[in-house]
A protein has these predicted regions:
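Helix-turn-helix DNA-binding elements, focusing on the entry/boundary residues of the two helices
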Residues: 24, 35, 46, 61-64
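Core residues of bacterial helix-turn-helix
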Residues: 31, 42, 52, 70-71
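Short amphipathic helical patch at the helix-1/turn junction of helix-turn-helix
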Residues: 18, 29-30, 58
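Short basic helix-loop element that most often maps to the first helix and adjoining turn
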Residues: 22-41
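DNA major-groove recognition helix of helix-turn-helix/homeodomain DNA-binding modules
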Residues: 43, 62-77
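Recognition helix of helix-turn-helix/homeodomain-like DNA-binding domains
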Residues: 42-59
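Short, charged recognition helix plus adjacent turn
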Residues: 1-14, 76-85
Length: 85
């Protein structure tokens, strides 16, 4: 896979990480949840969810697992080359 980077508000993300962010937003929409609902379920602020989805806050593996569990998606859903619905 070609290694490209994207800039968003001072952050630099690889194409792979940008893909993860897109899938994170998609999974939330598929689950029919708002950012406020997700934040409440995770015990976080809505700004946490927004920053994660925009790439302003780097996701760690534990956070990704929590999102995946809430959205009823396998971790592979969020990773390039493993597209599953």
């Amino acid at each position: 896979m070609e290694h490209r980077t994207h800039r968003r508000r001072g952050a630099v993300h690889t194409a792979e990480y940008q893909y993860l962010l897109e899938r994170l937003r998609e999974a939330r929409r598929q689950a029919g949840l708002t950012q406020v609902q997700v934040a409440k379920a995770l015990g976080r602020r809505q700004s946490f969810v927004t920053k994660c989805e925009l790439g302003e806050r780097r996701l760690d593996p534990v956070d990704l697992q929590r999102f995946a569990r809430l959205y009823h998606k396998p971790i592979s859903f969020f990773l390039p080359g493993t597209r599953k619905r």
